[in-house]
């Protein structure tokens, strides 16, 4: 151990205590330093060199000397006044705008009002749908890995309408095509399942029956659902329109879909989750499939005129050119050739994007005969085309692993033992449980067709493309001015394929049928001079022409080797007509092998394409917590609203100025109070930030104290372990000495020499503990830890004291307002707010009372006009015969003595009550429940009329009057006993 003089002086316990009572001067000095540092920070913030918020560094790795509170101290008065004024003016402007929108009345609809108030960015369009998580919902969730029905809301009950304006703003009248990965995942699962169980199927018998049949046959139906924050927009109304018309060829580069009505839902409609290739689908899918028969928009299109385009415009869903049916990430599902008929690329595969627009719709089989298209019997024998359309799959189709007839009534099926899943064929070793041989009439069928020239906006009629040797010069058969975009400017007088030089300079091939009908126009920008130079360069065509010869219906050129030029496979010009060389609308100078302008096929789609088509009705969006929308109200509610509107229109009040004044006064008070509270909140927030930062600094200091204490405890534990090791060493030495004594051995050069066996000596532990740490070094380190801990405790105590002081400086809202403003001069009128509110409430009550009185007076005036009408009929009685001559003696024929005194009888109270009650029952006031309280006025009206008739009022008192009654036609009057009768 070291001597007493070499030991460092120990820190007393008194010195280790934090100096809380003796450091008030230090606190004041700290406040002065902090104020100066805050001013420097504020200057740095203005110049952009400092952060506006001080970060908390618990470990002290950065900026130990900068322990700052937030730089935002209480705002100065002029700044607070400017902020208050701006907030006040802004609120008044906003309230004025809102009142202006409300006063517009019927100029806007409910969707527009909601779009005005709600967040216009309530949902975002999701373009990469493959990143959206999705799950299936079905009843058989335990077997197919789906969630149970009820996990998501029913889309038929829970929805929100999206206004048309918002749809146009987000989608720009373009409802795009999406290649959804959800059907591809379903097909991949089926494909993987078939591969894994291929060996197991070979051992099964034909009687084996499993639930997998339901999945393969498409009986497992469910929905696709997306979780929050995603949702689906389900289109309810849509139409198509052409876009980007090519001015050279006239074809539409794009066909866009405009959705005008949509709903936000969580799940799709029910559909088959998985199925193999089939032709006839379930009747539950008919409505969904029929919805994809999209009609043309109500714009000026040539195809809408059935006189020019028989059948009108085409209906269906247009899969755009360039669409990728199976993406590159899942290319193993493509197969060698496309199994979907017209849905294919230019090589008949699915490796490349689509080269031609493909239309898909629910087939209309009303005109079909025995499974063949209309006019199928009129085709050339062996041909697969009729009326300009080439048909695929007529006669035999593939349905649920069977070869089925295209005639749905026959339903003849032959099971092939193979199932097509995508582009792969899998064997099916046992008899399926589904019934294929049945009458499939009424089941929906997909119809896939392509317009190779892509002129659907001009006509829906398909044509047989002309060969080049059948294209001749018109020579007067074509008149007028037409183009590829204006087919109606020309007239033809003879059937044929006429080469025509348009006024724009390009060449046109006008296809005329039935001597007057133009069925198509193909064009190019190449003029006649350029074409004729190419024609003259052809071998042996110097003396030839393109004039029409022959007596055929379409005509032909004189020399077949000198027809309209085109480029061959070597991209060289040639005029030789070939057997399979046709002209196409989009390839005027190329060699085209397709004879017909349209291609069609029925069926041929599996569940993947079936789901893919049905899902095009939906668009994936990303929504917020509260997405705006209009919830459809019941019909009774709409009728009630209509009646209320009519009643309000009938009972419009003229004087509404006082209501507007009240509303403006309330808004002004709210704006002033809001602006004041906003400034108070800013001031209070400044103090709060300062206090919170002080508390954070104090917490950081206490954290450092804890870390130092932990280091000191570790050092003490180390010393204890050293002491324990040394004690253990001494104990080992003592044990060894005892063993030596028992073994009766002695040491010689650190070895024990004994006569006992060497195995006993191996039992003894000869390990020695070596440590260079002395007690003096350990005590010095303990002294250093104590000193450091004392300093940290003082610093932590100071920080806690400063934090408590800053926390006490936080004022409340009203004190902050008093500090920011001089309320005694500016807002001394605030003390009259209760009186103002009471006055406003009194005016409102007075207004309500006046409205009630006005309604009562109006009702009284209407009911008062209903009177009990008294009709007095005076009929003279015939004169006795014996007195007749006596009365006629005066020469006046008795009429002078017929002036009598009228006898009147007043109505009783009961009669007046009956008349009033009958008038009430027959009035429209009785049928409306809002006017039922007016029945309380009936007794007052009855009393008033009774007083008027009985003379109690004085001014309308009845007086006895004499009534002169003419005695004209008195002999025709009936004989009565009384002198007159009151009715």
UniProtKB/Swiss-Prot annotation:
Chain intervals with Basic and acidic residues compositional bias: 1-20
Membrane-crossing segments per the record: 833-853
Chain spans, region Immunosuppression: 723-739
Coiled coil ranges: 689-739, 780-815
Post-translational modification: Specific enzymatic cleavages in vivo yield mature proteins. Envelope glycoproteins are synthesized as an inactive precursor that is N-glycosylated and processed likely by host cell furin or by a furin-like protease in the Golgi to yield the mature SU and TM proteins. The cleavage site between SU and TM requires the minimal sequence [KR]-X-[KR]-R.
Region (Fusion peptide): 657-677
Gene3D superfamilies: ATP synthase delta/epsilon subunit, C-terminal domain
Lipidation (S-palmitoyl cysteine): 856
Function text: The surface protein (SU) attaches the virus to the host cell by binding to its receptor. This interaction triggers the refolding of the transmembrane protein (TM) and is thought to activate its fusogenic potential by unmasking its fusion peptide. Fusion occurs at the host cell plasma membrane.
Protein name per UniProt: Envelope glycoprotein gp160
Organism: Maedi visna virus (strain KV1772) (MVV)
